[in-house]
């Protein structure tokens, strides 16, 4: 069977995607699979690379080069294709794409239009989980605790910034955290200790999205639970992100590696059971399939607040998701195998729904 690996992408998380793809390629069982590389450049070109039958030697091999004219010429490692050309029989797509145009439902909708099986969550789940404001509305209705927050639209802020500042300061206390509504890997997030910093933080967030969310800052540990499955959902014991930085931003995650992971997290039994329960509720309410990682805040009073649910968590060497499953006895290669089977099962189920409506 062939796996079509989509990676790169136009989002700010392009480089993270390449790192994740390299790790996935080193975990796949090549005895059973061939892997077709499809690299999406930062400019949006889809570049078809070689068909791999063994592990790549370097992640630099994944940065495919191509002739801008689109011709197949010597000296280049790939060729530009139309996105629809990825459709093949006997293949499943693994979209190792993070952020907008990757895990926000757009690529999932495209793959469903092509009628291709793929790994991970569907269109609606991906779109809702990627949007921090929508996620909070849904999970609030489901009774999953979250920190206090204020959604802020860019046009509202531009029309009357004082009203927005008053609204935030009337509902929240400093420090506050400001985030783009649609972005991952902590891109565009900043901490505000006063009104001036809040203004700067909103300006930064609006560089990535026209919608932002302002959250109450709290003193808390950060624990994460991995979720796997379609209808039959399994969770891991939580792991903890141990930081030596003010907050877990993009550079801390992927550039400076200023974090450590404690797996499993040292928390009371009732805390990890509650985290697993909330993770299952969140996953189910959002219609999850395949995989997700649920991130929580844990206060010194053992209060849990769900921060976010990632439908395509990082798969790099520093990433929590595969490490959490490894701690549960599921090897990286076996995890990939399960994800592929879950994607096939979901596709077959969806085909059955179409046939039932004919």
Curated annotation (Swiss-Prot):
UniProt: ATP binding residues: 169-224
Record GO biological process: cell wall organization; peptidoglycan biosynthetic process; regulation of cell shape
PROSITE patterns listed in its UniProt record: ATP_GRASP, DALA_DALA_LIGASE_1, DALA_DALA_LIGASE_2
Record pathway: Cell wall biogenesis; peptidoglycan biosynthesis
Needed cofactors: Mg(2+); Mn(2+)
Reactions mediated catalytically: 2 D-alanine + ATP = D-alanyl-D-alanine + ADP + phosphate + H(+)
Span of domain ATP-grasp: 136-341
Signal sequence region: none
Residues holding Mg(2+) 2: 308, 310
EC number(s) stated in the UniProt entry for this protein: 6.3.2.4
Cofactor-binding details, from the entry: Binds 2 magnesium or manganese ions per subunit.
Keywords: ATP-binding, Cell shape, Cell wall biogenesis/degradation, Cytoplasm, Ligase, Magnesium, Manganese, Metal-binding, Nucleotide-binding, Peptidoglycan synthesis
Origin superkingdom: Bacteria
Binding sites annotated in the UniProt record for Mg(2+) 1: 295, 308
Principal cellular location given in the protein's record: cytoplasm
GO CC terms of this entry: cytosol
Major enzyme class: ligase
GO MF assignments: ATP binding; D-alanine-D-alanine ligase activity; metal ion binding
Function: Cell wall formation.
Family: Belongs to the D-alanine--D-alanine ligase family.
Descriptive protein name: D-alanine--D-alanine ligase
